[in-house]
């Protein structure tokens, strides 16, 4: 399993956006014989295809020998993570105080503690699409030769008023702007005769640099998707190196293990399916999220290429309604430093295997998909047979908070769904903690589940 863990650490280090996750998941799938469904006219048992949605989410299918109307075994994870997104007009210079500092103006994405994102090195990833359709990929901050970016904070010596505010307010979302550059007053201290920078020159110089290096202009940011993420690679924690520290482990720890379980699995009686979805952190809305027709459209494309008897629309509906799904998403690990937030009898712990969440939601299970015990028993039986370690848990104590996954969107099709993922400490922080043992068990769990009859 060492290769699995090392490959996982590399994957989350190199794929910090949903676009990169999709691009490299497709590459991995192709290495295992998966083809773009748009390149295939007919499908039969044993065929392996993927459905790419706008380069930001994807679904893989391994066609089984049974009629697809009998249902599929589905693994469903998400590949987006909390971050800071650049605004549409993102670059500005401090002209009021004439400091020469140039900033990237951002809007946070997903549920974050804003104070965790200041005074730390950040990288910029994304794509800029020019008016002629040319795409320019941006990746700055993780190469050793790259600069990084940073959001400044107030020194504690003068932060008395700031520190009186609640944690949700003492760093304002509107002030989560990263320093891009700082131009001094004098252009050349060794030769003052070269003149001084005037207000606005700093922004002009940044834009000039971007045009020379990337061929993009300020207007091109209107059609850009740029993300500020933590700079640096994932690392092992502790003397025993049993824990992994990395950005975006919610939910790429489940996405990667689901992907590898899927591509390594052989075709069985039931068709296997693996969803790597976007937009979960903001409610799964949008064309690349699960709160769209992402899944049923993909299944319809598969059914259209199969020799299905009868009404194809009914075949799609039956295929979905008769499916089994693991919503592969993470759960909050018990934190002994904050034990009062957890029901210790119903918590998940690092290093004890994958986690079953029968339900998620908030308060009175609002927004939950409550799994059926008959289905849970079926999954349990398979995991016992495959010697997979698992535990049962909730997110926290009742009324302490809550959360959701993509489970209820899949359940709308009438299928059986169970949340099953990896425990995470410091969830939604720039750097999250998982257990290498749990990652191994997730892989084993997902591989076993795909064999469910």
Go through the PLM ranges and name each one:
Residues 1-453:
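N-terminal hydrophobic/helix-forming segments and targeting peptides
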């Amino acid at each position: 399993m060492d290769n699995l863990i090392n490959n996982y650490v590399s994957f989350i280090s190199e794929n910090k956006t949903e676009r990169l996750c999709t691009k490299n998941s497709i590459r991995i799938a192709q290495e295992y014989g998966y083809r773009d469904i748009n390149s295939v006219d007919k499908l039969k048992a044993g065929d392996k295809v993927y459905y790419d949605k706008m380069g930001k989410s994807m679904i893989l299918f391994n066609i089984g020998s049974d009629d697809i109307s009998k249902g599929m075994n589905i693994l469903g994870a998400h590949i987006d993570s909390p971050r800071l997104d650049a605004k549409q007009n993102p670059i500005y210079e401090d002209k009021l105080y004439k400091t020469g500092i140039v900033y990237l103006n951002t809007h946070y994405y997903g549920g974050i503690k804003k104070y965790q994102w200041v005074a730390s090195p950040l990288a910029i990833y994304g794509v800029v699409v020019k008016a002629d359709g040319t795409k320019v990929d941006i990746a700055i901050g993780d190469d050793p030769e790259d600069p990084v970016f940073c959001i400044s904070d107030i020194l504690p010596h003068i932060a008395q008023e700031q520190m009186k505010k609640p944690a949700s307010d003492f760093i304002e979302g509107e002030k989560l702007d990263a320093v891009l550059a700082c131009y001094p007053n004098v252009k050349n201290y060794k030769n003052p005769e070269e003149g001084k920078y005037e207000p606005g020159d700093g922004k002009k110089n940044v834009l000039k640099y971007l045009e020379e290096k990337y061929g993009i202009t300020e207007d091109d940011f209107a059609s850009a998707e740029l993300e500020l993420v933590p700079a640096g690679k994932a690392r092992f924690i502790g003397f025993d190196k049993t824990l992994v520290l990395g950005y975006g482990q919610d939910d790429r720890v489940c996405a990667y293990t689901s992907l590898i379980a899927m591509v390594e699995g052989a075709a069985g009686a039931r068709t296997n399916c693996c969803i790597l979805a976007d937009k979960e952190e903001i409610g799964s809305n949008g064309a690349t999220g699960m709160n769209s027709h992402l899944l049923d459209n993909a299944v319809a494309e598969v059914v259209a290429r199969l020799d299905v008897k009868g009404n194809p629309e009914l075949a799609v509906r039956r295929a979905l309604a008769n499916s089994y799904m693991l919503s592969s998403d993470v759960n909050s690990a018990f934190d002994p430093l904050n034990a009062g937030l957890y029901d210790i009898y119903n918590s998940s712990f690092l290093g004890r295997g994958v986690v079953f969440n029968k339900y998620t939601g908030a308060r009175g299970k609002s927004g939950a998909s409550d799994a059926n015990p008959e289905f849970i028993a079926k999954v349990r039986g398979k995991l016992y047979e495959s010697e997979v370690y698992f535990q049962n848990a909730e997110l926290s104590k009742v009324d302490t908070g809550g959360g959701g996954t993509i489970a209820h969107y899949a359940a709308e099709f009438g299928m059986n769904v169970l949340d099953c993922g990896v425990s995470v400490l410091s969830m939604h922080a720039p750097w999250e903690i998982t257990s290498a043992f749990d990652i191994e068990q997730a892989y084993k769990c997902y591989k076993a589940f795909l064999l469910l009859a």
